[in-house]
Each structure stands twice: as C-alpha cells, then as structure tokens.
A protein has these predicted regions:
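A residue-level signal for beta-strand positions that form part of recognition/binding surfaces
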Residues: 25-27, 88, 100
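A short beta-strand motif that forms part of the nucleic acid-binding face
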Residues: 32, 43, 95
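N-terminal, charge-rich interaction modules
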Residues: 1-36, 40
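A contiguous, well-structured "functional interface" segment within a domain
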Residues: 1-7, 69, 73, 91
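Glycine- and acidic-rich phosphate- and metal-coordinating loops
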Residues: 88-95
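Residue-level detector of conserved catalytic or cofactor/ligand-binding positions
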Residues: 95-101
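Short, internal acidic amphipathic alpha-helical interface segments
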Residues: 41-86
Length: 102
C-alpha cells in the first residue's frame, strides 16, 4: 500500500487527509478540529454515465452518525475521486469543529 498526506488550513480549522492506495482503489481519511472522531463514511463506485456510456460517472453510499454533518463532504469527495480515478473510493470523515465561525 502507498500512502500520501495532505493538509489545509490553520489552527482549529486545520484539516488533514491521508490517502492510501489499496490496489487500484483508494481510501481517504479526512480529519480535523478539536476532537477527531468518526462522523461519516462514503463509498463511491464507478459506473457508465447515464447520458454517455463512454464517460465514467459514479454512485455513492453514505453512512452518517447521528448528529454529524460530514456526510456531504464524504459523499462529494468520494464521487469526485471516483470520476477522476475510475476506481472504487472510500472516504472516512473525522472532523469536529464546534461552532465554526468561518
């Protein structure tokens, strides 16, 4: 497995991501905030576009823990990465920012 780390932002708004290649597939863990914990996970899979079967599109399944709001981030990231890579992608979101102001 190959892994690569990324970061964006600063202080309480610092987000970090680790991407791990799992054969042809990809797993991404995105975390940040005061107390990281699992909030949502999305699994994106490639499929032919409904408009043009020669174009790769994607579908996603999402699990979001009660009270968490990371499902939109996990889903969007999974769908975009599947379109770019053409392989299955999982995105795990571990973000917790209390009362964000920006």
């Amino acid at each position: 497995m190959q892994a690569k780390s990324f970061s964006l932002g600063a202080q309480e708004y610092l987000l970090e991501a680790v991407a791990v290649r799992c054969g042809d597939d990809l797993t991404v863990v995105i975390g940040g905030g005061e107390k990281q914990h699992i909030g949502a996970v999305a699994v994106g899979v490639p499929r032919p576009s409904l408009k043009d079967k020669n174009i790769v599109s994607s579908s996603a399944s999402v699990l979001c823990l009660t009270g968490h709001k990371e499902d939109l981030l996990a889903r969007k990231a999974a769908l975009e990465l599947v379109r770019m890579l053409g392989h299955t992608v999982t995105v795990l979101s571990l973000i917790h920012i209390s009362e964000p102001t920006r």
